[in-house]
Every structure is written in structure tokens, then in C-alpha cells.
Amino acid sequence: MSDQEKISHTVIGRVVSDKMDKTITVLIERKVAHSLYKKYVRRFTKLHAHDENNECRMGDIVAIAGTRPLSKTKAWKLVDILERAR
């Protein structure tokens, strides 16, 4: 691969944990239509992402991208911090 890694899939979420070294937990929210009632309900997914410089804090809004598996549970990496927590 060249100097730039290929960025596959990018999602935006909120950091809910930064206690691990070089790893953050990101909460992804999506809205799905209920099959029977057709009302939109919120569904959540927690993903572990690689934060090389430990720069994220809880509450930050971040963009993460899929990458090769880095550990048993970590296959995402931090792309950008979109908004800092207040």
C-alpha cells in the first residue's frame, strides 16, 4: 500500500469512554423504522477505535474509519475530532 492508507467506511459518533490506553469507545446512533408500527426508533452500537495520541475525551464528537483488525475488538481508527466536549 502507498503512503496513504485506504479509508473504507467512515461513521460519526460520540466518545463514551477514554479509559483505555490508545483506545476509545464510540457510541453510534442510527434511526430505524419499526417493522410493524413504522415509527422511527433509535438503535445504538458501541465500537472500539484506535486513538494513537490519546487526544479524545469523553463527550467528543468524532469521525472514525474502518481499518484492518488491530486487536480482538478493535478494527476502527480515529480520523478526526469534529467537536470537543463542553
Swiss-Prot record:
Pfam annotation, one family: Ribosomal_S17
Keywords of this entry: Ribonucleoprotein, Ribosomal protein, RNA-binding, rRNA-binding
Top-level taxon of origin: Bacteria
Keyword Protease carried by entry: no
UniProt keyword Methyltransferase present: no
GO MF, one example: rRNA binding
InterPro entries: NA-bd_OB-fold (IPR012340), Ribosomal_uS17 (IPR000266), Ribosomal_uS17_bact/chlr (IPR019984)
Record's GO cellular component terms: cytosolic small ribosomal subunit
GO biological process: translation
Family named by the database record: Belongs to the universal ribosomal protein uS17 family.
Known role: One of the primary rRNA binding proteins, it binds specifically to the 5'-end of 16S ribosomal RNA.
Self-association state and partner proteins as the record states: Part of the 30S ribosomal subunit.
Protein name: Small ribosomal subunit protein uS17
Organism of origin: Nitrosococcus oceani (strain ATCC 19707 / BCRC 17464 / JCM 30415 / NCIMB 11848 / C-107)
Gene designation: rpsQ
